[in-house]
Amino acid sequence: MIQTILAVSIAGIAGTLLRFATGTWVSANWPRYFYAATLAVNIVGCLIIGVLYGLFLLRPEVPIEIRAGLIVGFVGGLTTFSSFSLDTLRLLESGQVPLALGYAGISVFGGLLATWAGLSLTRL
């Protein structure tokens, strides 16, 4: 159990740092499009979780430390529903209703599509 906790913690740090770096880069280069970082990490995270899920279905012998570390730790640290919610609220509060609705729709449906695509890649 300790090894699983360590794997989740270490991978979570990596995912969180990648999300932070993505947000910092987008803020520095495209401050008007602050929501793009959250959208990007969430869609990429969905793709990654689809691939990992598919791989782990094919390889059930992969140790729990690796499975939990990658899915719960790395992908959990990388993706964020709370930032998505805040970004959407900020867009709504600034009167950008069509953009907020588009962002929410792309986030949800794009995430589902990316997860499906990731899983499908493991079935080729």
UniProtKB/Swiss-Prot annotation:
Q: Which residues bind Na(+)?
A: G76, T79
Report any one BP term from Gene Ontology.
Answer: cellular detoxification of fluoride
In alphabetical order, the GO MF annotations are: fluoride channel activity; metal ion binding
One GO CC term, this protein: plasma membrane
Which keywords does this chain's UniProt record carry? Cell inner membrane, Cell membrane, Ion channel, Ion transport, Membrane, Metal-binding, Sodium, Transmembrane, Transmembrane helix, Transport
Has UniProt tagged this entry with the keyword Aminoacyl-tRNA synthetase? no
Q: What is its main location?
A: membrane
The cellular location(s) given in this protein's UniProt record come to: Cell inner membrane
Q: Secretion signal: which residues?
A: none
Q: How is its activity regulated?
A: Na(+) is not transported, but it plays an essential structural role and its presence is essential for fluoride channel function.
Which InterPro entries has this protein been placed in?
FluC
Q: Which reaction does it catalyse?
A: fluoride(in) = fluoride(out)
Q: Please tell me whether the keyword Nucleotide-binding is annotated for this protein.
A: no
Its topology with respect to the membrane? Multi-pass membrane protein
Top-level taxon of the source organism: Bacteria
Q: Where are the transmembrane segments?
A: 5-25, 38-58, 69-89, 99-119
Q: Tell me which family the UniProt entry assigns to this protein.
A: Belongs to the fluoride channel Fluc/FEX (TC 1.A.43) family.
Q: What does this protein do?
A: Fluoride-specific ion channel. Important for reducing fluoride concentration in the cell, thus reducing its toxicity.
Name it: Fluoride-specific ion channel FluC
Give the species this sequence originates from.
Pseudomonas syringae pv. syringae (strain B728a)
Q: Which gene encodes it?
A: fluC
